[in-house]
From Swiss-Prot:
It comes from the Eukaryota. It is a multi-pass membrane protein. InterPro entries: WD40_repeat_dom_sf. Keywords: Membrane, Transmembrane, Transmembrane helix. The chain crosses the membrane at residues 73-93, 878-898, 1089-1109. This is Uncharacterized protein YEL025C. It comes from Saccharomyces cerevisiae (strain ATCC 204508 / S288c) (Baker's yeast). SUPFAM superfamilies: WD40 repeat-like. GO terms for cellular component: cytoplasm; membrane; nucleus. It is found in: Membrane.
């Protein structure tokens, strides 16, 4: 569905158009590792997670095999005895259809089977899909209980597939119609009868326990198979059915065949024994369970059911999430036909005491009172029991694992160009919640501490590396009290004001020396022997800008070069230099808001657009590391301002464009520290944070050194470099960088050098259900918490920089059905918004919704406190609230319609909440889906009626114009099949003034980033609505005439089913143009996009929906589709293909969205809507595939 302004893009055919949307997913290792299954075999435990298989006998692993986090994940774990050459094979099935088989011998896993050509088993596989497996005579039978839910028919159509690995055949073996498969198994007749008359008949029984999707009926079906191995066929049309007692939807049920002749069916309420005879199934015994918790939705562990037949005793075991184990014994001698005992006594035993609020996901019993327990907070643990009690130990080198649910999410507004951090709220269980901050951090092993020592003088405020000084001794010179020391001797015996530098040879350079009008700037260059040499450049007072280059020798300074640039004021300029040590010099000069790059021939190489909102105080210039001859190098200018902002300018032709903007988390000035010329690394730091910037891939992240830096210096060396850090205790610590790196091919290593997501968690005794980051407030967020037991709510002001609660406010003791919290502040900053009557104040609107009436609160965030300004009751059951910031207007939508109120917080003598009457409100559907203001119109979206516009002239009372007239703030209760709704406005931007550096036909972003000229936006002033359906379908609509078909029905811009249960859907604030946290994107950030929506949910997965912008992406999309259509056959592989009776399966080797955790989302580059022929769209594009 093309927009009008996209018609200039080329199309491959007239029946399709490109949809420039992409989806990226984010998971740290602990969130990615979802437990698939586990088992105990021959004294060892085996734990299968999404990205690895682990085995051991104690708290130390014996062997493990792990898979790449950005590749396909394991969805099913099965074991097959006598598999090919192995006596026991561990089969792992992946979400992309591939299968790997391993045998475990001599404490290591060895792969014995690998196929990439298995079927995808109908549809998407979830990370936590529930699989059933059974093997018989080398054939694996498997089904996914979760994957075939039909949202239209509301039925489960589960399918069992058979995998014959000897013949290479995959067949659809068995399928249900409106029935859920509880369990299935196979029984050979030889197991039943020790009778010579049965020899050669080889009868096999297929037993399947089913539950109706339409009722609570539970029944067991028996199918018979006859024939020799390899030619057996089940007659699935003929079966015998045995009706069992019904079970509730939320009641657990388990079936196991023991010793080949007895079936045990275990439910919450009863246990039934069924005997298998040659003539059929006969009832053995029936028991009512006594001692098992009979509570609705009680949480038993699904993999903890176990039935063992020993010495005429059937031993039953089951465990729950609270680490309790329940056991019962049945003596088979007391069983006979139709025998019914009233009760089966279960005994309860505490395996171990979990930490407070922690719950178990797995309890696996090992021999001799030993267990493996996987808990939601503490991960994988080994438990041993003796007479003194239980001992819990963390399994060493085990998988990182947490099981948490995300309930709310926000992108942290960092004032920069890239999304680099997230704030999320969620829970581990119904009582334990958490707030989690995700930030980018480099691995701690990147810097190795070599030495740390106290300086020879006290109160050191600065230092310099002087390791080349002839007099030897201490390799540092220190500044203390305005004096310079080395080895306890004065290097300079008079105080200085600014501009001091000490060279590596111990020579002191200071401002004013040799006529300098600015600070001396160090210029490092790499010599042919890999040693680093140093020069200094500085501006000299003159009618023209004169730049002198000094080279520091052992006892003197030698003037090496001198350059003159006309028309620039040397006194007001900041000058920095780059040199390759021989033939090339480049100078960057900052003057009057403009950065300009000059060469040694006084020729201007590149210049930036004037920007007076960014005032630089320090700068660096570097050149890319692609060409030794410097013919096609990019020039990078890194500049820092006093407000904590750092910009990276990159040359394009003769223009310097802003490629990246980073802000200090604490709004403090960031010092710049270059490394060595051969490395694309720059440090940004202050006394609260250290950031490492990698210009090779434009990534950045925090460095954790375990100290507070006061000043940092670089000491070049043959092993790359060392980082020298002075702290506030006058101690200097030396860290060696990249000791594991090698010099040859170092550029490739720098490309892959990228920080990883790290989680910082703040634990809560209640559950966070809503959160909003406070704009322009130092690292604070407003969080709504609920106690799941008392149903009482409270607000919390949270500092996500320090990860501490700042202030809380408890609502009244009344119980509410739910609460609605909405912020009353603008998402953007502009000169127009700053003229508002209470600009800068942060207000929060809260509603406590009861059965008959709703309580209204108005709070203000003031002086790090939540202050209540107003509270009153609204005599209606309110289920949504709309906040229009421009007019301080609040619309309440409830059972009685829509009511409007004006908030008068600064109007003396007036009610804070003043009722307003608007006739247009009577025509508005008060239970509609999301709304937002566009000019004088209130726009609502209804799936069956498209975007409805109602004239709502409330802007006439506005004194000040708005740069951002559309502001969506509307919260809803669940309506029909829609569970989540969010609205995203792409505001109309202003055109930049023309200048000699910009093409005249380009539009550039203005606003809080002043311009950030890297983004070309042709598609502005748009509105998107995103919804999540009950079947986990993400649907995105666009406010456009093209979004309606010929019949007037609103057509989705995109519709796709996601592989996780989505709980939180939020619009992302404006201003971002790139995604820094993009781990699946070839170690590069995703640039040139507009982030639209943030989604998260039950499986710890986070999604960001973005829109591609710029002509580069449009051309890439065009080329991608053309290549895909022309080369589709070339990507196919048919090696060792498994045959299906109706379909030939093969799996493409190309990588794409499957790497991000999706299955079958990128199979076709175009998707058509069957019911509406005019509707055409395509799937989400994976930026990884497009880049390739």
């Amino acid at each position: 569905m093309a927009r009008q302004d996209e018609t200039d893009c080329k199309k491959l055919d007239s029946n399709s158009a490109f949809l420039p949307l992409c989806i990226t997913s984010y998971r740290s290792k602990d969130e990615a590792e979802k437990l698939v299954s586990c088992l105990h075999h021959e004294g060892s435990y085996f734990l299968c997670f999404s990205y690895g298989l682990y085995t051991g006998t104690s708290n130390e692993l014996k062997a493990k095999v792990e898979f790449a986090l950005d590749g396909p994940f394991v969805v099913n774990y099965a074991t097959v005895p006598m598999f090919m050459s192995a006596s026991f094979c561990h089969l792992l099935m992946f979400n992309d259809g591939s299968i790997k088989g391993f045998k475990c011998e001599n404490n290591k896993f060895e792969i014995i089977y690998d196929s990439n050509v298995a079927p995808k088993l109908d549809t998407i596989s979830l990370l936590t899909s529930s699989w059933l497996n059974a093997s018989f005579e080398g054939v694996l039978y498997t089904c996914n209980k979760n994957i075939s839910y039909d949202s239209d028919l509301h039925t489960l159509c589960t399918t069992i597939y058979s995998f014959d690995f000897r013949e290479g055949i995959v067949e659809r073996f068995y399928a249900t119609d409106g029935e859920e498969i509880i369990s299935f198994d196979f029984i050979s007749r030889e197991d039943l009868l020790d009778d010579a008359t049965c020899t050669g008949k080889s009868h096999v029984y297929f037993l399947c326990l089913l539950k109706s999707c339409y009722s609570e009926n539970l029944f067991l079906k028996e199918y018979n198979l006859a024939g020799k191995h390899g030619s057996r066929k089940f007659d699935l049309n003929e079966y015998r059915q045995y009706n069992l007692l019904p079970i509730c939807d939320n009641e657990f049920c388990y079936m196991k065949v023991v010793c080949g002749h007895t079936i045990v069916v275990l439910t919450t309420n009863y246990t039934q024994i069924i005997n298998i005879k040659a003539s059929g199934l006969t009832n053995g015994a029936f028991f009512n369970n006594k001692g098992l918790p009979n509570v609705e939705n009680y949480q038993f562990l699904k993999d903890s059911y176990d039935v063992i037949y020993e010495r005429s005793v059937i031993l039953l075991t089951i465990s729950d999430v609270y680490a309790n184990k329940y056991t019962a014994k049945i003596h088979t001698r007391s069983l006979h036909r139709d025998h019914v005992l009233k009760e089966l006594q279960w005994t309860k035993e505490r395996v171990f005491k979990p930490p407070k609020h922690d719950l178990c996901d797995v309890i696996l019993q090992l021999p001799r009172e030993k267990y493996i327990a996987v808990t939601r907070i503490n991960g994988v643990n080994f438990i041993s029991k003796d007479h003194r009690g239980s001992k819990l130990e963390k399994v060493k080198s085990g998988p990182a694992y947490t099981n948490k649910v995300y309930l709310a999410s926000q992108v942290i507004g960092n004032k920069g160009t890239d999304i680099d951090s997230l704030l999320l709220g969620g829970s581990f269980n119904s009582r334990r919640g958490f707030l989690e901050k995700k930030i980018l951090v480099y691995d701690k092993t990147l810097f190795k501490l070599v030495t740390s020592s106290k300086a020879l003088v006290e109160n050191v405020t600065d230092f310099w590396v002087t390791d080349l000084a002839l007099n030897g001794g201490d390799e540092f010179a220190y500044e203390s009290g305005g004096l310079i020391y080395k080895n306890g001797i004065f290097l300079m015996d008079e105080p200085y004001d600014y501009g001091l530098f000490v060279s590596r040879t111990g020579k002191v350079l200071k401002a004013g020396m040799d006529g300098s009008t600015g600070e001396f700037r160090q210029v490092d260059f790499l010599q042919s022997n890999h040693n680093s040499s140093t020069m200094f450049c500085y501006p000299v007072q003159n009618s023209k800008l004169r730049i002198s280059i000094l080279e520091a020798k052992s006892g003197f300074l030698r003037k090496k070069e001198e350059f003159f640039i006309h028309g620039l004021n040397s006194k007001e300029s900041i000058v920095s230099c780059f040199s390759d040590g021989a033939e090339k010099y480049l100078f960057v000069i900052y003057l009057d808001g403009v950065f300009s790059v000059w060469n040694a021939n006084q020729k201007k190489v590149a210049t930036s657009h004037p920007d007076y909102s960014f005032i630089a105080y320090d700068q660096l210039i570097k050149i890319s590391w692609l060409s030794k001859k410097h013919k096609h190098d990019s020039i990078y200018v890194i500049a820092s301002s006093y407000t904590g902002c750092v910009r990276v300018y990159k040359s394009e032709s003769n223009f310097l464009r802003v490629d990246l903007e980073i802000h200090s988390l604490y709004d403090q000035k960031l010092e710049l520290l270059d490394t060595i010329p051969s490395l694309p690394l720059v440090f940004l730091y202050n006394d609260k944070e250290i950031i490492l910037l990698n210009l090779q891939n434009m990534s950045y992240g925090c460095i954790q050194l375990g100290l507070v830096p006061r000043r940092m210096r670089i000491r070049p060396g043959k092993a790359l470099f060392s980082l020298c850090v002075l702290d506030y205790d006058s101690r200097i610590s030396i860290f060696e960088f990249g000791s594991t790196f090698y010099r040859e091919g170092f550029t490739k290593q720098m490309t892959s050098l990228k920080p990883q997501l790290e989680n910082h968690i703040f634990y809560l005794p209640s559950i966070p259900v809503e959160l909003y980051t406070v704009p322009n407030n130092l690292n604070q967020a407003v969080v709504c918490l609920v106690d799941s037991n008392s149903r009482q709510y409270k607000l919390m002001l949270f500092n996500y920089a320090s990860m501490k609660a700042v202030s809380t406010f408890s609502f009244s003791d009344e119980k509410y059905l739910h609460a609605v919290v909405k912020p009353l502040w603008p998402e953007q900053n502009s000169i127009y918004l700053s003229q508002r009557p209470f600009y800068g104040n942060k207000f929060v609107v809260c509603l406590g919704v009861g059965e008959k009436r709703t309580k209204f609160w108005l709070f203000e965030i003031r002086n790090n406190n939540i202050t209540q300004l107003y509270a009153n009751y609204l005599e209606d059951c309110i289920f949504s609230v709309f906040i229009y910031y421009e007019c301080n207007l609040v619309l309440f939508s409830g059972d009685s319609g829509i009511a409007a109120y004006k908030i008068n917080m600064l109007k003396e003598g007036a009610e804070i909440l003043e009722a307003y009457s608007f006739p247009a409100l009577s025509s508005i559907n008060h239970i509609g889906l999301p709304a937002y203001m566009s000019g004088d119109y209130l726009v609502q979206f209804e799936i069956l009626r498209d975007f409805l516009r109602t004239r709502f002239p409330i802007r006439t009372s506005i004194v000040y114009p708005s740069e951002y007239p559309e502001c969506p703030y509307l919260g809803f209760k669940r309506l029909g099949s829609i569970t989540q709704v969010a609205t995203k406005i792409i505001p109309k931007k202003l055109r930049e003034p023309k200048n000699d550096c910009l093409a005249s036909d380009k539009n550039y972003l203005l606003g809080r980033l002043s311009d950030l000229s890297c983004a070309t936006l042709k598609y502005s002033n748009r509105s998107y609505v995103a919804t999540i359906g009950i079947d986990n379908t993400l649907t995105i609509y666009e406010d456009s005439k093209l979004s309606v078909d010929k019949g007037g029905l609103a057509m989705p811009y995109l519709k796709i089913r996601l592989p996780n249960k989505i709980i939180s859907l939020a619009a992302i604030p404006d201003g971002f143009q790139n995604l820094q946290i993009c781990p699946n994107f070839n170690s590069q950030r995703l640039e040139g996009v507009i982030p639209l929506f943030l989604l998260c949910g039950t499986e710890g997965q986070i999604y960001i929906i973005s829109e591609f912008i710029g002509e580069l992406w449009m051309r890439t999309l065009h080329d991608y589709k053309k290549i895909k259509l022309e080369c589709k056959r070339a990507f196919r592989r048919s090696e060792k293909s498994m045959r299906n009776v109706t379909k030939q399966y093969s799996v493409s080797k190309e990588t794409g969205i499957n790497e991000s955790g999706f299955d079958e989302l990128a199979r076709n580059s175009k998707r058509r809507h069957i019911d509406h022929s005019p509707y055409k769209t395509i799937d989400f594009f994976d930026p990884v595939k497009l880049k390739r």
